[in-house]
């Protein structure tokens, strides 16, 4: 199965109207992690990645490269609460928020109807004590994902769009490894859902709509800043090369290579706003970077 955003959103909206499912808020804020992913009750159908009401699929303009894996992203914010806009950083989401990301490979990129192989689902949970991250690895039957505190290696394969079979030793990270990317000033934090990386159009109920506008309507965020400088899609050949390069480096490297990141001692800053010759080791302006 190709877990297409537009398809499962259409299905989930129909199912949501029945209002029969809800997230288990207590599991998100508990001091202990559930042993299996289903205990959170994020999905109507876990295998098909169909979310329950108030668990919203979302996409990023430019995404982290992860050994060619595909990803499905979801966000849950407790009812009556919203994420607050923060300039140049992710929205400040309230306690009880869950960010969910499932990694998978299609069986064959040339025919996505042949299905997919779910590998892991990572969850980032905002508890009273702060954000905590943990990974769940899917079983071979694709019916459940089990907590992996110490991580796991998964041997898998897939056929790419050129018809070449690729073997992958996929690594599910342990809990300490999550901190390597999600650590800002030595505190775990989300790194993906920044306004500038969410500012794109998606299809909702058959109609195109700006993603930020949708999240605002759904009460996930409290505002949309004016004059957003959206990141470039690094795979879009119509965009200037320097903008694509900056977007790729910012998303793949900038969360560590910034003043508050774990690689700050290198003084090589690659976050989106870095323009200093000293920190970029390049030219003075963004336009001359590449």
Give the role of each language-model region.
Residues 1-9:
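Bacterial N-terminal signal peptides that target proteins for export
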Residues 23-72:
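N-terminal pre-domain segments of enzymes
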Residues 64, 71-79, 85-247:
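Extended surface/linker regions that mediate inter-domain or inter-protein docking
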Residues 32-35, 244, 248:
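Extracytoplasmic/secreted proteins, especially bacterial periplasmic and envelope-associated proteins
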Residues 278-287:
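Conserved small/polar residues in nucleotide/adenosyl-binding loops
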Residues 175-191, 251-270, 276:
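Periplasmic/extracellular electron-transfer cofactor-ligation site
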């Amino acid at each position: 199965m190709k877990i297409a955003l537009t398809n499962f959103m259409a299905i989930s909206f129909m199912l949501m109207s029945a209002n029969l499912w809800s997230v288990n808020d207590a599991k998100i804020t508990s001091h202990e992690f559930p042993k299996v992913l289903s205990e959170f009750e994020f999905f109507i159908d876990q295998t098909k990645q169909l979310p329950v009401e108030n668990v919203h699929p979302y996409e990023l303009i430019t995404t982290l490269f992860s050994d060619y894996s595909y990803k499905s992203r979801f966000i849950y914010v407790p009812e009556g609460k919203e994420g607050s806009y923060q300039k140049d950083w992710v929205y400040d989401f309230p306690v009880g928020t869950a960010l969910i990301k499932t990694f998978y490979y299609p069986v064959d990129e040339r025919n996505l109807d042949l299905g997919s192989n779910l590998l892991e689902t990572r969850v980032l949970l905002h508890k009273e004590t702060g954000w905590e991250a943990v990974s769940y690895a899917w079983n071979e039957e694709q019916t459940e994902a089990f907590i992996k505190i110490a991580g796991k290696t998964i041997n898998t394969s897939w056929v790419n769009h050129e018809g070449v079979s690729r073997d992958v030793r996929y690594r599910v990270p342990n809990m300490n490894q999550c901190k390597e990317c999600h650590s800002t000033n030595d505190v775990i934090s989300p790194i993906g859902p920044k306004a500038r990386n969410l500012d794109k159009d998606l299809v909702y109920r058959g109609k195109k709509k700006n993603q930020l506008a949708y999240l605002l309507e759904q009460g996930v965020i409290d505002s949309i800043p004016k004059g957003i400088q959206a990141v470039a899609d690094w795979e879009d050949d119509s965009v200037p090369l320097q903008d694509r390069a900056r977007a790729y480096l910012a998303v793949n490297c900038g969360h560590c290579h910034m003043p508050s990141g774990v690689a700050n001692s290198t003084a090589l800053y690659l976050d989106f706003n870095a323009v200093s010759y000293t920190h970029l080791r390049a030219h003075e302006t963004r336009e001359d970077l590449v």
